[in-house]
Amino acid sequence: MGEIQKITVKNPIVEMDGDEMTRIIWQFIKDKLILPYLNVDLKYYDLGIEYRDKTDDKVTTDAAEAILQYGVGVKCATITPDEARVKEFNLKKMWLSPNGTLRNVIGGTVFREPIVIDNIPRIVPSWEKPIIIGRHAFGDQYKATDVVIPAAGDLKLVFKPKDGGEVQEFPVYQFDGPGVALSMYNTDASITDFAESSFQLAIERKLNLFSSTKNTILKKYDGKFKDIFEGLYASKYKTKMDELGIWYEHRLIDDMVAQMLKSKGGYIIAMKNYDGDVQSDIVAQGFGSLGLMTSVLVTPDGKAFESEAAHGTVTRHYRQHQQGKETSTNSIASIYAWTRGLIQRGKLDDTPEVVKFAEELEKAVIETVSKDNIMTKDLALTQGKTDRSSYVTTEEFIDGVANRLNKNLGY
C-alpha cells in the first residue's frame, strides 16, 4: 500500500457535531474517511444537546453564522428535546430544533435525495434513478394560525394595508355551530427564492424539474406558486434548460404522485411545505430505507450550503452501545453529509481534486455494499437476511468503506 497523498481543501468547512449514536459514527467517519485523505480546516461547533444547553443554544446560531461566512457546513444528526429529553439531560429549557434554527438563519430550500444501491431491494421496483424532493421550508401550515370556533357566528379575513389604504374584508364562513378555522400565508419573495433554488439545482444536475400544487382548488394561493415558477422559467431559465435538453413542467399534486409511482425516477419535484414534508419520507422508504436519504439546505445565490443525514440520532442503538453491546448502525447518509459538503466546497473553490475525492468516497460506499456485500443490519434485512453472518458492526462497515476506497485509489 502506497502512502496516502493528502489533498488540500482550500477554504474552511463548518463542522457541526451531534448526539448519541450518530455522534459516535461522525467521529469514526472523520478519523477513518476524511482526515487521513484531506488537509482541511474544520471550524468545529458542538451541537450536542449538553453543549447547546450550556451555551443557551448560542452555539447553534454561531454555527449558522459561520456557514454564512464560509459557505459550506456539514452537520451530524442532533436531538430535538421533548419533555423526556429535558428531564434526561436536566436541560434549562426545551430548546428548538437545531435544523429549524439553521434554516431560519440561512434561509434557502431543503432538497432530499435517496441514495440508490443496486442490490438493495426497492419497495417501488420501477424506481431506477433518484427522485429529488425540493421542499419549500417556509410558511403555509407550519406558520399558520389555527383556532377552535366555539359557537355559531361569522368568520372573516381582514387585511389592513401598512400605508393606511382601504381595509379589505373577506367573508370565510358562516358557522351554525362549533368548528375549526385556519389562516396561513406565504410571500412572493420566499416563493421566488424557492423557485430559483429549484431551477439552479435542475441545471446543475441536468434533471427535469416539476412543481406540484393544487391550483385548481386554491386558484390564488397555489396559483401564485405556479405563476412565479412559470414566470422565472420563461424569463430566466428556459434557454439554458433547452441547451441541456431538460425542461420544467407544472403538475397537479394528485397527478404528480401518481406519475411518480409509475416513473423510473431521475427528476426533481419542487413541493410546497406540507407536500414536501410528506413526500420526502414516501420517496425515502420507496427506495428502500430512511437511512439512505441525503438532505441539503441551499440558498438561491449558492453562497450558503449545509448537508446532513435525513435521519435522527439512532437512540435505540446508542442505548445498546451504552450497555457495551455491539451495534450495526447504517452510516451511509452521514458519510454523504460529508461528501456533499466537500463537493460543494470543491466547486466553490474551483478545486476539482476535492470534488473527485468526494465522488470516489461515494463510489466506495456504494461498492462496499453492492460489490463487497458488506452492509449493516438494516440493509441485510431488506434482502430478507437475519443471520449474524450477513451483516457487520457499525465500525466494521466504515472500515470496509476505507478498504474499498484505498483499493479504488490504488493505495
UniProtKB/Swiss-Prot annotation:
Induction: By N-alkanes.
Keywords annotated in UniProt: Glyoxylate bypass, Magnesium, Manganese, Metal-binding, NADP, Oxidoreductase, Peroxisome, Tricarboxylic acid cycle
Cofactor(s) required, per the database record: Mg(2+); Mn(2+)
Site (Critical for catalysis): Y142, K214
Residues that bind substrate: T80, S97, P98, N99, G100, T101, L102, R103, R112, R135
GO cellular component entries: mitochondrion; peroxisome
Binding site for Mn(2+): D254, D277
Major subcellular site: other
Gene3D superfamilies cross-referenced by the UniProt entry: Isopropylmalate Dehydrogenase
SUPFAM superfamilies: Isocitrate/Isopropylmalate dehydrogenase-like
Recorded GO MF terms: isocitrate dehydrogenase (NADP+) activity; magnesium ion binding; NAD binding
Enzyme Commission number, as recorded: 1.1.1.42
Localization in the cell: Peroxisome
Family: Belongs to the isocitrate and isopropylmalate dehydrogenases family.
Protein name (Swiss-Prot/TrEMBL): Isocitrate dehydrogenase [NADP] peroxisomal
Organism of derivation: Candida tropicalis (Yeast)
